[in-house]
């Protein structure tokens, strides 16, 4: 049975969410403390990248709960802020690689390509679905 789609707030302001995710096939992936610690670290990094504030995080043996707040804003996330967030999520080398890529786009006059990539990153900001996807992909 498919899960019920998330009901997400639309518009500016702060919204609060209780997110739950279970392991597939009734596996107990988080039984070991190291796995729980790894998931908690990934959640913190993914939240920083996504612009989401973690309020509480509980990791059980086969599922986890996240309580978070998301503040929507009409202001777009700047290019430098996106690069900083990529560094938090994937490390300084990935952030530097992205900076060089975008600098090369700008130097070559490929502004449409640069803007398209910026739009893809901005679409992932302040979005709980993108946050959960990012976190699970990194685990």
Regions found by a protein language model. Name each.
Residues 1-139:
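Short catalytic/metal-binding and nucleic-acid-binding patches
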């Amino acid at each position: 049975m498919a899960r019920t789609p998330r009901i997400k707030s639309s518009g500016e302001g702060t919204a609060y969410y209780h997110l739950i995710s279970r392991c597939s096939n009734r596996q107990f992936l988080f039984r070991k403390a190291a796995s729980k610690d790894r998931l908690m670290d990934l959640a913190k990094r993914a939240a920083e990248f996504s612009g989401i504030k973690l309020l509480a995080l509980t990791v059980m043996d086969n599922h986890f709960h996240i309580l978070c707040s998301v503040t929507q804003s009409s202001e777009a996330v700047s290019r430098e802020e996106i690069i900083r967030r990529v560094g938090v999520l994937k490390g300084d080398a990935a952030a530097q690689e992205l900076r060089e890529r975008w600098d090369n786009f700008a130097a070559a006059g490929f502004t449409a390509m640069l803007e398209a990539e910026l739009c893809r990153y901005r679409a992932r900001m302040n979005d709980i679905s993108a946050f959960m996807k990012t976190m699970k992909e990194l685990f």
